[in-house]
């Protein structure tokens, strides 16, 4: 069985949360989404939360190498995947910091910053997923499905965070809009999860992968089916209140954490 490194679970989970949240929130603001307009007043809190999560993610990335100074040494080779992760993460950090400073000064975050941050977020997600796609001798990861998996996970995590902020700080009656976005994100990740399962089942022939049926069922129940039910009932008007969004986010976080544990358990070397 592959060695499970929980630092990488934390790193990939928080990177997905940061990038996905900026993508969902930024694209919504560019489209003048009325459900997110009222959330603009809490943009400072949102950007600070994302900055903290990004900082924790980078610390986790540094510790997974065993000796944190190796993370800094990697920048001597800017073309290395670790250096690329660090550079793209810093670019996202600068974007979040600019947005936070403008919000702190009481200014509206310029819309031009959202496409820039969205491109940086996509770049960071691509680099983080390519680390595993390009890893030599790991059949379970060396597929384009890995890239789609990382993007789908980020979108789901981002939708959960934005859904929460809309419920906490948005105007009454706007929850249905974001609930539909959250529901769409869940179904997208369901499709991606099935695609990844098919890849593991029929596309990996050279190694024997560990059985993770119990964890898969747990992940689907907590991380996909439960959020789908919550989002649907909110969208249909049968559920209301801030606790709904907190429950949705909690289920998604637990589900995606389990998903990453499963992902790394499949990292069997040839």
Describe each region flagged by the PLM.
Residues 1-19, 149:
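Hydrophobic transmembrane alpha-helical segments in integral membrane proteins
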Residues 14-16, 33-36, 79, 86-90, ...:
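Long, contiguous internal "core" modules enriched in hydrophobic/ aromatic residues
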Residues 17, 21-28, 33-92:
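Membrane helical hairpin/interfacial module
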Residues 28, 166, 262-263:
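A short, amphipathic alpha-helical segment
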Residues 60-68, 196-202, 264:
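Hydrophobic transmembrane helix segments
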Residues 257-270:
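Juxtamembrane boundary at the C-terminal end of a transmembrane helix
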